[in-house]
Amino acid sequence: MPRFVTALLPLLACLPLMAQATDAQKKFAGTWEAKFKDKVICTIRLKAGDPISGETAGCSINVDENGDLKEPDSADRPDDPSPIFNPKIHDDTLTFEEKDGDEVLKFELKVVGDGQAELRILNSPVPLKPIHFARK
C-alpha cells in the first residue's frame, strides 16, 4: 500500500469521532437562560470548540429549605461573567466547574428536550432541585 494511503487511514478513522464530538457540542452551544417569575436569574453562554468553553453571567440562584427557587436578592447579582473550567461532555450531559472565591462549584447541565436543559449544582451545601434553562 502506498505510504500516503497508509498515513491517511488513521486520519480517516478519526473523522467519525470528530463529527460525534462536534454534534455533542452543538447540543450545548448557545445562550441558556434560567428564569424565575419571568426574570432572568442566570445566563450560561457556551461556545463549541476543542474543548467546549463558556461562562456564566448574572447568576443569582436562591432556594428555600425544600430546594425550590425563590425570589433572588437584587444585591446578590454578580457583575462580571465567570468562566467555566474542566468542561466534559458525556451524551446529553455537560459537567463543568466555576470558581467562586476560594470555592470550586461543580455543575451538571443536562439537555432534556429541544432547547431545554436542567442544571444541577453537584456540590451545593443544601439540596437543590434541578434548575430549568431554555436556549435563547
Where are these regions (language model features)?
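Residue-level recognition of beta-strand termini and adjacent short loop/turns
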Residues: 113-115
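Bacterial N-terminal signal peptides
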Residues: 7-16
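Central antiparallel beta-sheet cores of small beta-barrel/beta-sandwich binding domains
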Residues: 21-106, 120-131, 135-136
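Positively charged n-region of N-terminal signal peptides that target proteins for export
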Residues: 1-6
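Extended lipid/amphipathic-ligand handling interfaces
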Residues: 109
